[in-house]
Design a protein with these regions (language model features):
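Structural preference for beta-rich elements and adjacent junctions enriched in aromatics
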Residues: 1-126
């Protein structure tokens, strides 16, 4: 498991700003190199920067890939079938975790997973 320090900032981050903009240049970069075992051997280069202001957290992903797919457009649709990134946040003292997934078009899927035990219908409790 990778650990990453999320820098605290004074106010909301501009998520429309460029990767190297003043808003983001001081945020630590983490290289994402964990891929699901059932994925193909094709692994694009992925980096992420994150920040928080005490009220929310903000992230930018940078993906370098020559093959992309972007079909899902509805909130909470199956973006995992598209070119996507995902990350997980475990709240302190809480049960479970938040699962965020974004496709390359910006469509988001978000679940709060209380029990990640796999069943034939997905997770046991989400």
């Amino acid at each position: 498991m990778n650990c990453y320090h999320v820098k605290k900032i004074a106010g909301p981050a501009d998520i429309a700003a460029d990767w190297n903009s003043a808003d983001w240049k001081d945020a630590e970069i983490i290289k994402i190199n964990n891929f699901r075992p059932e994925s193909s051997n094709h692994h694009p280069e992925v980096e992420c920067r994150m920040q928080h202001d005490g009220k929310g957290f903000y992230g930018l992903f940078q993906v370098k890939d020559k093959y992309i797919r972007c079909v899902a457009t509805e909130y909470n649709s199956s973006v995992c079938r598209d070119s996507c990134v995902e990350f997980f946040v475990e709240p302190p003292g809480g049960q479970g975790y938040l699962n965020f997934e974004f496709n390359c078009g910006g469509t988001m899927l978000l679940f709060y997973v209380k029990d990640c035990t796999r069943t034939d219908k997905g997770f046991k409790d989400f």
